[in-house]
Amino acid sequence: MKPRFAFSISATDGAARAGVIAMQRGEIRTPAFMPVGTAATVKAMRPAEVRAAGADIILGNTYHLMLRPTAERMARFGGLHKFMGWDRPILTDSGGYQVMSLSALTKQSEEGVAFKSHLDGSRHMLTPERSMEIQRLLGSDIVMAFDECPPAGVDARRAEASMERSMRWAARSRAGFDAGEEHAARSALFGIQQGSLDEKLRARSAATLIDIGFDGYAIGGLAVGEGQAAMFGVLDFAPAQLPADRPRYLMGVGKPDDLVGAVARGVDMFDCVLPTRSGRNGQAFTWDGPLNIRNAKFADDQEPLDASCGCPVCTIWSRGYLHHLVRAGEMLGAMLMTQHNIHFYQDLMQAMRDAITTGRFAAFRSDFAARYRRA
């Protein structure tokens, strides 16, 4: 019988870890990058293409799905997996970040967040209990606790108050998750560390989460405008504050060099809209750095996006053809650019897993930094 949730570390190299998360719907190799399926789709890609690119798990957005098509409707279809045709693990976020960043007229209280939908202005209330209910209706494999994510640059008092509220919501999320006994028996719940950039606040947050008890732990409150140096500053201490025998998930990150730097600091899981959003806007990620295929210099370029990439896009089509598709606004352009980017991100994760396993991660990191030119 497949386990509900089990995490094993197969190799370490410095703080970097390679391992496997085993769940009933399949294994997730770590370090792992999760393509984002905001509205029950990884934009511009079919599920089979996402899997063929190397993804073991994708992410779904509770906020977007609760508004359209609604969690209750997806439950009638048999859950998010059947609805979208993806049979492997899905992690769903709690909806807290999107509520604060996308919704108009939000009102926070100890109970939760009251908000108006950005789609039609309808009124909703999202609480830890409702977030757990929605994620249960979706049939999520990895459920995220409901938290409050303050913007970058908040003062110490606001950061502390926000962290403490998130910890109270974490306890309510735990109780709400456990109340759904049938779903809880086959899925996992992750807690989210908060505390802004403050080491002591994050230590308190981690201690509280560990006391509550979770299957995995996320590092929240980053990638909100603080910049890479500040983010890495937090990652120099935050992962070590969390249990070594549980997965560590850095939410909303990020650029390829962010991923390499975070893995070097002990992070196991990532998600970000960047590869899909960038693909739709004509930006490709390559081992030599990002390139904007819209630029006129690519019009006559007969080379692939990345000569060292083995994805279907790079083995068939030229930069010149992709330039034409994107400039002409053809749907295929967004599809092919996205497909390449998802392949590149998964190839990057595999390269890091291999480097950790063979004890050469430091050399890989140095070589990557020397070659990759950040836009």
Swiss-Prot record:
What is this protein identified as?
Queuine tRNA-ribosyltransferase
Q: Name one GO molecular function term.
A: tRNA-guanosine(34) queuine transglycosylase activity
Q: Which family does it belong to?
A: Belongs to the queuine tRNA-ribosyltransferase family.
Q: In which pathway does it act?
A: tRNA modification; tRNA-queuosine biosynthesis
Cofactor: binding comment:
Binds 1 zinc ion per subunit.
What EC number(s) are associated with this protein in UniProt? Answer: 2.4.2.29
Catalyzed reactions: 7-aminomethyl-7-carbaguanine + guanosine(34) in tRNA = 7-aminomethyl-7-carbaguanosine(34) in tRNA + guanine
* Binding-site residues, Zn(2+): 309, 311, 314, 340
Q: Which organism is it from?
A: Sphingopyxis alaskensis (strain DSM 13593 / LMG 18877 / RB2256) (Sphingomonas alaskensis)
The UniProt entry's coiled-coil ranges are none
Kindly name one Pfam family recorded for this protein: TGT
